[in-house]
A protein has these predicted regions:
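Short, glycine/acidic-rich hinge or "gate" loops at secondary-structure transitions
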Residues: 271, 390-397, 541-544
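Charge-dense, extended regions
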Residues: 538-562
Length: 563
């Protein structure tokens, strides 16, 4: 199915219809904009709470080191990531100014300078409309990523009321940021929503007020910074056991958030983008083996006891902890070199894995722990592979709303005008003989030419109904493709739960929509297979297999309707 082609064909039909109606002046341009929008890249907004780790997440997702990351909240405005080739690698970002100045390529140092809330930083940020990153990544060929500042910066402004009271400029900038953030997210075709391990209560309000079109169809949740979770474990628990507890708690928390926002988000996955970034950087630089060698100088019976999550102990310049580490051959300069610029909790997780596992196993464990490969796979399936479908679906829904408005508001209004005109024409007819008949006839002719008649309005109504029916059919076709695509993804995951290659081949043909092979299936066969798969759905304990078989039964149901 070519979503863009079919969407544009339908919009062309709508435009041709509008051209021949009294609403040409008001609506033709709008539908032409819908036509143009159908062919543009899908807009994917990254939204969420302030300090939820959006910049770290984007860096990890795109394999970049561009978006500013730090412990200080970044003041910068909207960040837009588009596909292309950077002309000057030393200036990887283009600044778009509020005052209309020509866009200006800038260095990474400029981006890093937008952290904090000094008067100098605020003055610089006030002049920026947005920052644009050109990224040579094929994922972005049909998707534009937009990183927003974070909704909690104003919604929760009471948390920093005193700081804002003494800095009106900061409050003004915050207000501008939240407004732009909301506007962009509201206009986005799809959303990645980032939250900490505990989503703030105003997240639900943000969904309803700023993203009314959000649904599991076009939104995925990310529970970020799982490296910050402190495990609830008994005394004496080993360090690797603590990490497994963190992973378990992260999974439970993300499942809780997924259930909380089940009507808004397709899923909520736990990630640590900082961990993923640091692991890749450490192994790429070849320093992982050296770090492992240094960490393992700590005797095994002492590691669990002395290596804890208190950074002050690791960086102690004197006292018992410093003495202990020096006896292990780890003086302060070595300890500082090992930790580098890694966030402390991320360093702890990496150190424990390197101490406990062989090098390759440690990397596999850490990458899996970070969750980034899983979220990349989900985003690829939910957004990057579906960008055309998401974009066209959004355009069609907006066009549908306009057509419904014309039918329910504009048509009755025009009908009222026609009825008033009929009354007026009757008055003119009754006035013959009392006034100049030629003048009355001319007046009546003018009224008839410039207003539609009731029959015309009935035809307009029928045409709109026909267009809405076609639109609904196209949207359902897209939804059907979405469902079968989801089924194909599930089929690969649960292949081992099927009874051999024959069952797999049956479902692959069914979900692939191979019309020639499906035409050969009789109604009796479809009915029998639907009952068998429905029974299997009731029996299985696998949630993924249940989801797949629900789609399978639905597909057989549709085939039966056509038999």
């Amino acid at each position: 199915m070519n979503e863009i082609k079919q969407t544009r064909q339908l919009l062309t039909e709508i435009i041709d219809f509008i051209k021949a109606t009294p609403w040409k002046a008001d609506y033709q341009n709008r539908f032409e904009r819908f036509y143009d929008a159908a062919g543009k890249p899908c807009v994917l907004a990254v939204a969420g709470q302030v300090k939820a780790g959006k910049s770290s997440f984007l860096n990890a997702l795109l394999g970049l080191d561009l978006a500013a990351v730090g412990t200080t909240e970044t003041t910068a405005t909207i960040n837009v990531f588009r596909y292309g080739r950077v002309k000057n690698p030393d200036r990887p970002v283009v600044v778009y100014w509020n005052d209309g100045r020509a866009p200006e390529p800038q260095t990474k140092a400029f981006i890093d300078s937008l952290q904090g809330y000094t008067e100098e930083v605020l003055e610089k940020a006030e002049g920026i409309d947005h920052l644009e990153y050109i990224v040579e990544d094929e994922k972005l060929e049909e998707i534009t990523l937009v990183d927003t500042p974070g909704f909690a910066s104003v919604v929760d402004k009471h948390e920093e009321r005193m700081a804002d009271y003494f800095s009106p400029r900061r409050e003004k900038l915050r207000s501008k940021q939240i407004e732009k953030s909301g506007d962009i997210t509201e206009k986005a075709d799809a959303v990645i929503f980032l939250s900490g391990p505990v989503a703030k209560a105003n997240a639900q309000r943000f969904f309803s007020e700023r993203i009314p079109h959000i649904s599991p169809f076009n939104a995925v949740g990310v529970m970020a910074k799982i490296d910050m979770i402190r495990p609830t474990v008994a005394m004496g628990t080993g360090k690797m056991e603590e990490l497994e507890c963190v992973r378990k708690e992260a999974s439970e928390l993300s499942a809780f958030l997924a259930n909380t926002f089940k009507h808004d988000l397709h899923s909520v996955l736990p990630v640590s983008a900082s961990l993923y970034h640091c692991v890749n950087k450490l192994w790429h630089s070849g320093k992982a083996a050296q770090m492992q060698e240094m960490i393992r100088k700590i005797p095994q019976d002492k590691f669990d006891k002395h290596f804890d999550q208190n950074s002050e102990h690791w960086y102690a310049q004197d006292g018992p902890y410093n003495s202990f580490y020096e006896k292990c051959g780890l003086d302060l300069s070595i300890r500082q070199s090992i930790a580098g610029d890694m966030p402390w909790m991320v360093f702890c997780i990496i150190a424990v894995a390197l101490y406990s596992k062989p090098l390759d196993e440690a990397k596999s464990f850490l990458v899996d722990f970070s969750g980034m490969e899983r979220i990349k796979s989900v985003l690829n399936d939910r957004f990057f592979k579906r960008s055309r479908s998401i974009r066209c679906s959004r355009v069609l829904h907006e066009a549908q709303q306009v057509l419904v408005y014309i039918k329910n508001i504009e048509l009755p209004r025009k009908l009222t005008e026609v009825q008033s005109r009929e009354t007026f024409l009757k008055i003119i007819a009754d006035s013959h003989g009392r006034y100049d008949n030629n003048l009355l006839d001319a007046f009546a002719a003018f009224v008839k030419v410039n207003l539609s008649d009731a029959g015309e309005l009935d035809r307009y109504s029928e045409s709109i109904d026909s267009l809405l029916a076609k639109m609904e059919g196209l949207l359902k076709a897209m939804e059907g493709i979405e469902k079968t695509n989801a089924g194909m993804q599930l089929l690969d995951k649960v292949k081992n739960l099927l009874h051999g290659e024959k069952e797999f081949a049956e479902l692959e043909i069914l979900l692939d929509g191979n019309n020639e092979k499906l035409k050969m299936l009789t109604a009796d066969y479809c009915n029998k297979r639907q009952r068998i798969w429905n029974a299997r759905k009731q029996q299985t304990n696998s949630e993924e297999l249940k989801k797949l078989l629900a789609i399978v039964c639905d597909c057989y149901g549709k085939l039966l309707k056509n038999r």
